[in-house]
């Protein structure tokens, strides 16, 4: 074929391509025209996201780093990230190796509280802290049949290093995985990431004083956040079902605002918990909370930090005082600091708490038998624990009698 012929053929193809592009643009314009209340949505800051023959709505809100949400300004996140990077602590909330925009604060709104394929996520909300701002982004499912667009809009721009949620390990992310599985052939893969679920820490620290360790309760009791004219989360499913029928934006504006506050509260709560863990000036002052923090350190095998917390509580009067003393004595024993452990066991041997009293008496018996070789004293101490036999398990009772029999043999030989 001549050069002229080739050029003519290319010209035809170019014309066809231009025509297809115009048709596609026309389709998209028509799709925009089909979106109910589009002008009202846009006035609220929402924009359509079109994917294939589906759409969702996206809203973006920005806050300055100086903005205070409860006790903290968002700029304080950088401070706690710096503290984590300077710390040698091993902890589930550690952000060592991260910077502030690696944390992805995430929450969802769903059509129900149960799990499984019958429960639909209709709102994905997330926040990120950048060098000069905090950005909250929300992806709304306008009606059933548009989930591919919803998750495409979310996954196409989300680069998650570590997720920060409140009950997200048990609820939010499993729900995302379930919905993603149903349409995975049309979507990018879900990312791999670390996960900080703040609910677990909240339960550890505050379950002794909160009937429900919900995010709303933690906001009021710990973060100093008072929501005004908030749409409660439990109303979200009902409002969404009304919205599906009516499509009126006013039905969901309150839900969107509630979700926005939720993800912002995750930032403040992460700052709050991190400061309690890392900063002496923010360490728990209330005795039961300080004990809970010590047990959290124990769970992470951070013995020195746990001892530091427990030593502050030795002479404090509170409900779990003897349990705290017992934990401290066992940590001393672990570090071979028996001269500090024994006085605690002797004090606990007179405790009103049967469990602590029995544990302390057994530790004293072990000490006199194995360390001091004072078998008579070990026997005397072990027999003291027979008074608690009624509250012991069958296995514990059997072990106690074996110990006493062994000590009698050693003492008489």
UniProtKB/Swiss-Prot annotation:
A Pfam family of the record is RNase_H_2
InterPro entries from the UniProt entry: RNaseH-like_sf, TPR-like_helical_dom_sf, YprB_RNase_H-like_dom
**Annotated transmembrane regions:** none
Judging by the UniProt lineage, the source's domain of life is Bacteria
Name of the molecule in the record: Uncharacterized protein YprB
Q: Which organism is it from?
A: Bacillus subtilis (strain 168)
């Amino acid at each position: 074929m001549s050069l002229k012929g080739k050029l003519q053929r290319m010209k035809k193809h170019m014309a066809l391509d231009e025509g297809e592009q115009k048709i596609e643009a026309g389709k998209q314009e028509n799709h925009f025209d089909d979106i109910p209340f589009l002008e009202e949505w846009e006035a609220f800051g929402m924009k359509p996201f079109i994917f294939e023959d589906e759409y969702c709505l996206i809203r973006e809100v920005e806050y300055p780093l100086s903005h205070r949400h409860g006790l903290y300004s968002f700029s304080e996140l950088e401070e706690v990230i710096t503290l984590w990077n300077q710390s040698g602590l091993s902890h589930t909330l550690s952000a060592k190796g991260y910077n502030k925009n690696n944390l992805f604060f995430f929450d969802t709104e769903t059509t129900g509280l149960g799990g499984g394929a019958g429960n639909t996520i209709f709102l994905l909300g997330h926040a990120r802290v950048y060098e000069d701002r905090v950005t909250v982004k929300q992806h709304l499912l306008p009606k059933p049949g548009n989930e591919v667009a919803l998750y495409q809009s979310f996954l196409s721009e989300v680069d998650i290093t570590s997720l920060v949620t409140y009950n997200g390990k048990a609820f939010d992310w499993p729900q995302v995985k379930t919905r993603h599985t149903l349409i995975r052939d049309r979507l990018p893969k879900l990312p791999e990431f670390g996960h900080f679920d703040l609910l677990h820490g909240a339960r550890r620290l505050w379950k002794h004083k909160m009937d429900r360790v919900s995010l709303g309760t933690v906001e009021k009791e710990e973060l100093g956040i008072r929501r005004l004219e908030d749409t409660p989360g439990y109303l979200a499913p009902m409002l969404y079902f009304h919205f599906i029928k009516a499509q009126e934006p006013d039905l969901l504006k309150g839900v969107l605002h509630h979700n926005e506050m939720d993800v912002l509260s995750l930032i403040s709560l992460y700052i709050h918990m991190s400061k309690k863990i890392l900063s002496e000036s923010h360490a728990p002052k209330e005795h039961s909370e300080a004990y809970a923090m010590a047990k959290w350190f124990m769970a992470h095998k951070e013995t020195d930090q746990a001892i530091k917390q427990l030593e502050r509580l030795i002479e404090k009067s509170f409900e779990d005082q003897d349990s705290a003393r017992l934990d401290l004595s066992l940590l001393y024993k672990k570090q071979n600091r028996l001269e500090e452990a024994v006085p605690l066991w002797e004090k606990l041997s007179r405790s009103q708490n049967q469990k602590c009293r029995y544990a302390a008496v057994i530790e004293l018996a072990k000490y006199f038998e194995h360390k001091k070789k004072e078998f008579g004293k070990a026997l005397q101490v072990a027999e003291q624990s027979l008074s608690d036999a009624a509250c012991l398990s069958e296995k514990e009772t059997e072990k106690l009698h074996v110990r006493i029999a062994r000590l009698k043999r050693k003492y008489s030989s």
